[in-house]
């Protein structure tokens, strides 16, 4: 395609996007206001809980005001973290110096947090999801709906699975996903950003005002400082959200080696190609345009590769020679860099399915992280990338 044709095509896309009329923020009501619960209270979990609680408080015609947030209880200088959150209205360990709404209630009991919820927002490190949903089985409303803010996959003998699909499989409830160019501290400080929510209205949808749909989800997550676009491509935003963390490790490696912005840009270019290829190969229902047009796609890739935990961990690995696991413990204050476990999961799946050679960047990140391959070998390892057509 000629450069002028590409420019015209891009202009048409942007013009169409700007002309779209957004009716999703018009008045929405519910016959019985929906109760919302958040599972997870780390840096991002607390930030999303803040967003949600602000909206439930402002929209009593649609949501019950109180939002319960499940907290894995721990002691902070001899005081339970839940007690600190509920009295000082700050998560002093994972989101310090950010005031939380008074209607956000920290709860150390997972079942009491979620048993009456109509909407459950999952926001925990994805390696803990299996243990959490196993406790919730049979303990929640059968017609509850869910949104996963997790980044990663469930890899098993039968293949690679979206975490939203895993939640649906294990709990029998419809689950969507939220992902975007969202560094938690910036959202928590109410610096303007945007995100993507993906949700497919299920076959058993009970009707407007009786069930969760795109309009309700926009009302739940959209804030003046946190703009939301709701789509139906759950696979697309989930794939992009998981794999961008692996790409970010690669960017951290070259940053730590002192190779500069050109090298980081090359990693992102290769990474975007492999993300799209992965979606096409293993989740054909995903839409290529999601990666380009949504915050959850290339925008999130750029943001994550410019900062965040995965880049920090990989940069420190390059500078110190320490393992990813050790660096994670040293600098993340109990949080996790999801790219480390995702790189291993993706490798396991690509190896079992015989596709490792088609994803040289993903494989290089795995080999450097877990097989002690020197980071300086990264350029030669990704040189033979098959371009996505």
UniProtKB/Swiss-Prot annotation:
Q: Say if the entry is tagged with keyword Cytoplasm.
A: yes
- E.C. number, please? 1.1.1.8
Q: What are the entry keywords?
A: Cytoplasm, NAD, Oxidoreductase
Question: A Gene Ontology CC term for this entry?
Answer: nucleus
Name the predominant localization.
cytoplasm
Q: Which reaction does it catalyse?
A: sn-glycerol 3-phosphate + NAD(+) = dihydroxyacetone phosphate + NADH + H(+)
Q: Which InterPro entries match?
A: 6-PGluconate_DH-like_C_sf (IPR008927), 6PGD_dom2 (IPR013328), G3P_DH_NAD-dep (IPR006168), G3P_DH_NAD-dep_C (IPR006109), G3P_DH_NAD-dep_euk (IPR017751), G3P_DH_NAD-dep_N (IPR011128), NAD(P)-bd_dom_sf (IPR036291)
Residues holding NAD(+): 40-45, 128, 151, 184, 309, 338
What would you give as a GO molecular function for this chain, any one? Answer: NAD binding
GO BP terms: namely: carbohydrate metabolic process; glycerol-3-phosphate catabolic process
Q: Which residues form the active site?
A: 244 (proton acceptor)
Binding sites annotated in the UniProt record for substrate: 151, 309-310
Localization (cell): Cytoplasm
If you read the UniProt record, what top EC class would you report for this enzyme, in one word?
oxidoreductase
The entry assigns this protein to a family as follows: Belongs to the NAD-dependent glycerol-3-phosphate dehydrogenase family.
Q: Name the NCBIfam families for this protein.
A: glycerol3P_DH
This one is known as: Glycerol-3-phosphate dehydrogenase [NAD(+)] 2
Organism in which the protein naturally occurs: Zygosaccharomyces rouxii
- Gene name for this UniProt entry: GPD2
């Amino acid at each position: 395609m000629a450069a002028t044709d590409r420019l015209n095509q891009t202009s048409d896309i942007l013009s169409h996007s700007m002309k779209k009329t957004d009716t999703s923020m018009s008045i929405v009501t519910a016959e019985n206001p929906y109760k919302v619960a958040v599972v997870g209270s780390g840096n991002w979990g607390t930030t999303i809980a803040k967003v949600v609680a602000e909206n439930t408080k402002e929209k009593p015609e649609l949501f019950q005001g109180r939002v319960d947030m499940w907290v894995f209880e721990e002691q902070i200088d001899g005081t339970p973290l839940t007690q600190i959150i509920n009295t000082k209205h700050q998560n002093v360990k994972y989101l310090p110096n950010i005031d939380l709404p008074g209607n956000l209630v920290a709860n150390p009991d997972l079942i009491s947090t979620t048993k009456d919820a109509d909407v459950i927002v999952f926001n925990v490190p994805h390696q803990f999801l299996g243990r959490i949903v196993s406790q919730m089985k049979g303990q929640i409303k059968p017609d509850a709906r869910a949104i996963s803010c997790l980044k990663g996959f469930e890899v098993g003998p039968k293949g690679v699975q979206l975490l939203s699909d895993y939640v649906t499989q294990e709990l029998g409830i419809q689950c969507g996903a939220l992902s975007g160019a969202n560094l938690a501290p910036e959202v928590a400080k109410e610096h303007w950003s945007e995100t993507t929510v993906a949700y497919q209205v299920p076959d058993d949808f009970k009707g407007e005002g009786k069930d969760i749909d795109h309009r309700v989800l926009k009302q739940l997550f959209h804030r003046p400082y946190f703009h939301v676009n709701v789509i139906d491509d759950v696979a697309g935003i989930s794939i992009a959200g998981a794999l961008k963390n692996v790409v970010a490790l690669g960017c951290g490696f070259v940053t730590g080696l002192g190779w500069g912005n050109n090298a980081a840009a090359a990693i992102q270019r290769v990474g975007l190609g492999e993300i799209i290829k992965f979606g096409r190969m293993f989740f054909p229902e995903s839409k290529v345009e999601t990666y380009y047009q949504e915050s959850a796609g290339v925008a999130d890739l750029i943001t994550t590769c410019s900062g965040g935990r995965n880049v920090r961990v990989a940069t420190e690995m390059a500078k110190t020679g320490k393992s990813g696991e050790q660096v994670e413990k040293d600098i993340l204050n109990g949080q996790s860099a999801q790219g480390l476990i995702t790189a291993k999961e993706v490798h396991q799946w690509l190896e079992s399915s015989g596709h490792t050679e088609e994803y040289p960047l993903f494989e290089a990140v795995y080999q450097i992280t877990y097989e002690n391959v020197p980071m300086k070998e990264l350029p030669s390892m990704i040189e033979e990338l098959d371009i996505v057509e």
